């Protein structure tokens, strides 16, 4: 795992709002999976940067509860209307071309899985040393 990937995973975890994004490309093909921070600004940056390249993006929390669903770059389903309003505050200027999407706190899902496996291994090694 590269140092910048490890750093990004730790930055996502420091937001205390991590979840998963599933990006479905136009014309089919394999979906792309990401772990990302679920802050309104980060969600807007992710959707604003990737939304028009994807037919659909589904974002869930770590318990697989729907946070937001997009269709062709537009918010479609957002169960928490307060969160939806906060996402729109950041997303609308991006969609209107008034500003570029900012930094996105996200890594591919396999990178996150590798990080957690590495973390589990370190915990196991520490426990073995205590014996």
Regions found by a protein language model. Name each.
Residues 14, 18-24:
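A short beta-strand micro-motif
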């Amino acid at each position: 795992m590269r140092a910048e990937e490890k750093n990004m995973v730790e930055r996502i975890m420091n937001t205390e709002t991590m979840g998963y994004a599933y990006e479905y490309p136009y014309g089919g093909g394999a979906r792309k999976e990401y772990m990302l921070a679920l802050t309104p600004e980060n969600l807007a940056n992710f959707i604003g940067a990737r939304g028009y390249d994807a037919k659909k993006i589904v974002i869930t929390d770590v318990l697989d509860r729907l946070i937001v669903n997009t269709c062709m770059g537009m918010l479609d389903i957002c169960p928490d209307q307060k969160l939806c309003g906060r996402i729109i505050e950041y997303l609308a200027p991006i969609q209107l071309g008034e500003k570029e999407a900012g930094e996105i706190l996200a890594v591919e899902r396999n990178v996150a899985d590798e990080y957690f496996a590495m973390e589990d291994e370190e915990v196991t090694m520490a426990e073995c040393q205590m014996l």
